[in-house]
Amino acid sequence: EVVDAMNPLLLFALLSLALADKYALIFQGDTGYTNYSDSSNACRAYEDLIDSGIPADHIIYMANEMIHSEEKNPWPGKLFTLPDPEGPGWDHAAVCKEHYDYTSQHITPEIVLAVLSQDEEKVKQLTGLENPKVFHTTEDDTIFVYYSDHGYEGGVVCGSERISKRQIHEALTSLHERHAYSKMAFFLEACESGSVFDTLPAELNVYAFTSANATELAWSEHCPPDDVVNGKEFGTCMSMFYDNEYQRLWETESTTITLGELFQRTHDHVAKYLHQEVSEYGNLSMRDLPMTTFIGDKPIKARTMVASKPSTLVAKSEVPLHVAKWAAIRSGKKDLSELRDLVYARAKEEIEVMRLGASILGEKEMDQKKDGDTLVYNSACATTLFENLMDKCGHTLPFPSMTRNIVHAICSGEAVPCVNWE
């Protein structure tokens, strides 16, 4: 006998599935040739999403378009994450470079948060664009977010400013309260990226996958001297270690791998070589979801494979010095002015932080604490001190290990110490 009517719950589920759509946002939060790795991995992510079947009109791409014409770029108009010393390499820009929705002039906290929050009128006001690309998603849709930049405990860099953990949580909460998505995956590449999501409420239905925990640095990969494509040296780090591994995995297993498998295998691979703890936060029940919940259902084309063993890994805080040293080595010139200036700037910042530590902890305790991390400390205090070092003293991100160690030691008490920043 034919059933007169389909089960209402089953019918609702099928209709919801039919109406559901997938959207993605890719943000590079920085500019400059030293940050080539953020440009290249963001571009690779865009290419992978397109290959997986996400239509271009369902992807928002904000990144530094000036990287293509950067004077130091040996391959203008191209972007590579992987070296290929004697071959043509894998150029990601062949797909991404014609699809910038927002460029370097738009990389500001206000615009990023407005785009993420789907506030079209605010984006219009801030950008001057008549028809800016802003999504208007529904409670049936899924959203994938990728953000790559420098970070610190409690936030990430965005252009010449910062986006705080609180601001990101507020944007996600606003979307959730407006029923603008069913599920969200947020991938964050930044030093101390775990600090942005370590208190993320599970009820927001967001799965956060970060390159590091709340206190550790992220690492760059394929840095000089392993920075060559077809005989030309890039003179910078080509990509980020965490990104290369998870992108390799989803490129080869995009139709079968789950969020949890992607996390665990990336975590384990990175942990074999570095003290960089890839982490996960938020709604961890989403670990069993296939990656195709957020990316397309088509297999991503497998191309050049990342070697099983990484090449020339450099902590993100040390990239400028590493790059300057190799520029001096390769040039053969006696002029070491660029390297000298960087070494002086780093020494100045170290002295200022050591003076701060000595004034609060005393010289002997500061000297003991500067080479090892304090595991128990007040994170709100640390965030305040890090922000003051940037705002009052002009220190730059990412902070080197010694700065982080001294700040953590200072913040081992309950209260934020009184500091004269003059």
Give names to the regions the model predicted:
Residues 18-422:
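Cysteine endopeptidase catalytic domains of the caspase/legumain-like
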